[in-house]
């Protein structure tokens, strides 16, 4: 099964209908990722069906029906998950992809151009030099201490969003309380063939 067929099939089985333009953009990114991955080891997930579910739909599903922020920042963007997918799901939002590893940042810069996102998405290497946006996203793994440092720079009405699992909810609530934040209702979803997932959310402001 091709990557495009895999995305369509997994989306349908997961109960979502992806626009053809979004599927095409994902396919262009996957092709570019495959080329770079031969020499730069950007991801271990290279098989089309697995990548469609574990990378692309896992990033897109919880964002598709969520009102877009004006701005977002993806911390530890890696190969573009979830930041590049967030840019596709939120076509009016301006985004910053933060990736300190030079080779990965070079890939992201090329991918942003290949997907014609240059006008509203930029790549940065140092989080301390970036103004954090309305939504701070992270699918990367960070120690709680590192997340606490990042939270200290989030605007009063900003929101921290972390990809996780339902069993993470209780520890998440305890963790964000140490930042002076409060947890927000998680966004639950399930990609066909994967375990239940959710977006863990927190803010220090009045957002709901």
Q: Could you say what each language-model-derived stretch is?
A:
Residues 65-66, 87-89:
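Short, charge-rich binding segments
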């Amino acid at each position: 099964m091709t990557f495009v067929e895999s995305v369509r099939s997994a989306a349908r089985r997961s109960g979502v209908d992806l626009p053809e333009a979004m599927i095409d953009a994902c396919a262009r990114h996957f092709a570019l990722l495959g080329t770079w991955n031969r020499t730069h080891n950007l991801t271990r997930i290279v098989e089309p069906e697995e990548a469609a579910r574990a990378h692309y739909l896992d990033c897109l599903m919880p964002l598709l029906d969520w009102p877009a922020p004006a701005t977002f920042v993806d911390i530890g963007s890696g190969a573009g998950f979830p930041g590049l997918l967030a840019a596709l799901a939120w076509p009016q939002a301006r985004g910053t992809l933060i990736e300190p590893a030079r080779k990965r940042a070079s890939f992201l810069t090329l991918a942003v151009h290949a997907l014609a996102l240059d006008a509203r998405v930029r790549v940065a290497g140092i989080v301390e030099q970036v103004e954090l946006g309305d939504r701070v996203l992270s699918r990367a793994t960070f120690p709680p201490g590192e997340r606490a440092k990042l939270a200290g720079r989030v605007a009063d009405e900003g929101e921290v969003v972390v990809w996780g699992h339902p069993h993470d909810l209780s520890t998440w609530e305890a963790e964000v309380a140490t930042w002076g934040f409060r947890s927000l209702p998680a966004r639950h979803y399930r990609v066909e063939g994967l375990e239940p997932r959710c977006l863990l959310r927190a803010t220090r402001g009045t957002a709901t």
